[in-house]
Amino acid sequence: DKGFGFITPDDGSKDVFVHFSAIQNDGYKSLDEGQKVSFTIESGAK
């Protein structure tokens, strides 16, 4: 709903910020709580 959120890595490391524009998916770019995803961390402006 907000356009951003956080991913909790399985390895217990710190949560990772994710913006909806980074989601590579056809159609509506959203993630559901608890959904399993794969991701690559990229540095960007804060």
From Swiss-Prot:
Cell compartment(s), UniProt: Cytoplasm
A matching Pfam family: CSD
Subunit structure comment from the entry: Homodimer.
Domain of life, per lineage: Bacteria
Record protein name field: Major cold shock protein
One MF term in the entry's GO annotations: DNA binding
GO cellular component terms listed in the entry, alphabetical order: cytosol
InterPro entries attached to this UniProt entry: Cold_shock_CspA (IPR012156), CSD (IPR011129), CSD_CS (IPR019844), CSP_DNA-bd (IPR002059), NA-bd_OB-fold (IPR012340)
Domain CSD: 1-46
